[in-house]
Amino acid sequence: MNTILFQSANVLDVRSLQLKAGQDVWVENGLIKSVVPHQPDVFIASGTNVIKAQGKTLMPGLIDCHVHVIAAHLNLNVTANQPNVFATLRALPIMKGMLMRGFTTVRDAGGGDWNLAEATRTDMVEGPRIFASGRALSQTGGHGDGRPRSDVIEPCGCSS
């Protein structure tokens, strides 16, 4: 069993809307098991990872429901036309930055794929958990329509 004890952390109680100082937060196998006032004489099992958090505020991970982890450029044509390996390499610092800002889960709304999600899940790279939608859907002529503008009067070229 993987047990973590955050000792004496500040924790926001969302029911009372109070920031409670000196709380011990017990986590087992990735799940919060209890939040109790700090008890200096409490038994701590061997192998427990104890993190002294006095003066620090503990909060759950943030979730962003609309990201594009491969959007390293604001120019969508540059982003869409770059080789996949470049898109991946440019996504790595973006993903790590998301994690360092507290986002532990993101929904990629177009661009990032299952492979990037799997790379973070298996700790191959640092980043948030990614729920990838795959390719973006867009209306004709919208920002996701990668076709160039055309002034052709007969778009299909089939009339004589």
Predicted regions and their residues:
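Metal-associated gating/positioning segment near the N- to mid-region
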Residues: 56-122, 140-145
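Short secondary-structure capping/turn micro-motifs that flank functional sites
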Residues: 42, 114-115, 136
